[in-house]
Amino acid sequence: MENFGIVAFVLFIVALVFIVKTIKVVPQQDAWVVERLGKYHATLGPGLNIVVPFVDRIAYKHVLKEIPLDVPPQVCITRDNTQLQVDGILYFQITDAMRASYGSSNYVAAITQLAQTTLRSVIGKMELDKTFEERDHINTTIVNAIDESAANWGVKGLRYEIKDLNTFILAANAHQQVEIHSHRQSVPH
């Protein structure tokens, strides 16, 4: 009789572990990617979900809310050879959890690099005066470039905001900039 109690207790514990491993509750605005034996099987949406224990595993957990990403400040050179330090923030959202998991090894680094290279390209085509006036154009161009490329990564760029635009002149270029400025002042208009 004593053995029956121990066996019943062990079976109860095994059943409890089985139930805990089977039932998964995904929070609202989340998506979990399930792999079955190492291969993509399904994406679990919010609510109560059932998986096969010891065969299925939760490989990735993604938040589907809007995510702010601080893009590191970088130096950009305008068409008139003025250096700007530009600091911005990118807002994005995961639209496809499966693609976000398998489309890129690191989608955050990928969209950060894409935002930086697009920013350098756009500012390189403008003169200094235009960069301050055309902030909205710069922001829109960056978001469009991210949307084009990031669709394969399961990510959508929502908006990009330039936080800070700072001009600075390096010591080596200071003399040249002063000469150009004085030459412009001496030429009659």
Give, region by region, the residue ranges found by the protein language model:
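Single-pass alpha-helical transmembrane signal-anchor segments
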Residues: 2-23
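Transmembrane-cytosolic junction motif
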Residues: 17-37
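A general, composition-driven signal for non-globular sequence regions
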Residues: 15-18, 30, 119, 178
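Feature targets compositionally biased, intrinsically disordered low-complexity regions
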Residues: 4, 44-46, 183
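Assembly-interface segments of oligomeric complexes
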Residues: 177-189
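Prokaryotic Sec-type signal peptides and long signal-anchor helices
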Residues: 13-16, 172, 186
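Amphipathic, interface-forming alpha-helical segments with heptad-repeat character
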Residues: 34-45, 49-177
